């Protein structure tokens, strides 16, 4: 199974996402994609659409670990269920750094949505300073981001996104990707995605790299042409 996912972050309006989704479903129909390809997109909360498309799934970028309640600025399971959404990103570095989500908080979110049967995209990644400390330090750092996470959960997808490569246009080298993914494969048998400045130019090489089961795409997923070019690179 190859997984191609697009994280829209705080981009695209509801109308833009609706247009994007309609075009994507049509293009995937024409491509006659196989059952070995999974395509997911993650719009912002105000742009969520009902998850009823033929060839791809809608997921959420974030949600609080509750059915509903007094959690200003958040959404809960009830809101996701209304859209028939059962996919969620957890642990993204921007949630960890910008919003102060620590490992205990992330663990609670993971357990809640695992119990709800969600497919979970669990993100891990290191700052450049940590990578520069060497392989053992990197292994310890990434391993700590898996503390408390059930790595045997059958609907777990691990997305490795080196923080220094996110949104910078500077992807990790193929050697760095293979080395890190091979190390992560000693922790878990879950699918391993790479994220960090993935684009139509480098997607095929990344997808052909050993231990890489797919990609989590950021800015290159916002344009239907570039995103579908990345999907085509998986064939």
Swiss-Prot record:
Residues that hold substrate according to the record: 7-9, 167, 197
Major subcellular site: cytoplasm
One of the record's GO molecular function terms: triose-phosphate isomerase activity
Role description: Involved in the gluconeogenesis. Catalyzes stereospecifically the conversion of dihydroxyacetone phosphate (DHAP) to D-glyceraldehyde-3-phosphate (G3P).
E.C. designation(s): 5.3.1.1
Cellular localisation: Cytoplasm
Annotated active site: 92, 161
Protein name: Triosephosphate isomerase
GO-annotated biological processes: gluconeogenesis; glyceraldehyde-3-phosphate biosynthetic process; glycerol catabolic process; glycolytic process
Subunit structure, interactors included: Homodimer.
InterPro entries to which the protein is assigned, alphabetical: Aldolase_TIM, TIM_sf, TrioseP_Isoase_bac/euk, Triosephosphate_isomerase, Triosephosphate_isomerase_AS
Family per record: Belongs to the triosephosphate isomerase family.
Enzyme class: isomerase
Entry GO CC: cytosol
Pathway in which this enzyme or protein is active: Carbohydrate biosynthesis; gluconeogenesis; Carbohydrate degradation; glycolysis; D-glyceraldehyde 3-phosphate from glycerone phosphate: step 1/1
Keywords: Cytoplasm, Gluconeogenesis, Glycolysis, Isomerase
């Amino acid at each position: 199974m190859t997984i191609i996912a697009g994280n829209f972050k705080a981009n695209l309006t509801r109308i833009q996402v609706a247009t994007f989704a309609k075009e994507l479903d049509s293009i995937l129909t024409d491509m006659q994609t196989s059952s070995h390809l999974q395509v997911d997109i993650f719009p912002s909360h105000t742009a969520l659409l009902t998850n009823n498309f033929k060839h791809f799934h809608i997921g959420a970028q974030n949600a609080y670990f509750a059915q509903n309640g007094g959690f200003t600025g958040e959404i809960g399971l009830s809101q996701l269920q209304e859209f028939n959404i059962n996919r969620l990103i957890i642990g993204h570095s921007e949630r960890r750094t910008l919003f102060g989500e620590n490992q205990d908080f992330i663990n609670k979110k993971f357990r809640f949505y695992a119990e709800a049967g969600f497919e979970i995209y669990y993100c891990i990644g290191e700052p450049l300073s940590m990578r520069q400390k060497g392989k053992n330090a990197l292994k310890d750092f990434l391993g700590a981001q898996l503390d408390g996470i059930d790595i045997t959960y059958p609907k777990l997808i691990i997305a490795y996104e080196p923080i220094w490569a996110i949104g910078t246009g500077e992807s990790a080298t193929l050697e760095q990707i293979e080395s890190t993914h091979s190390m992560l494969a000693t922790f878990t048998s879950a699918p391993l995605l790479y994220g960090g400045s993935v684009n139509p130019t480098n997607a095929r090489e990344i997808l052909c790299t050993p231990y890489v089961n797919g990609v989590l795409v950021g800015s290159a997923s916002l344009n239907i042409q570039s995103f579908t070019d990345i999907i085509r690179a998986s064939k």
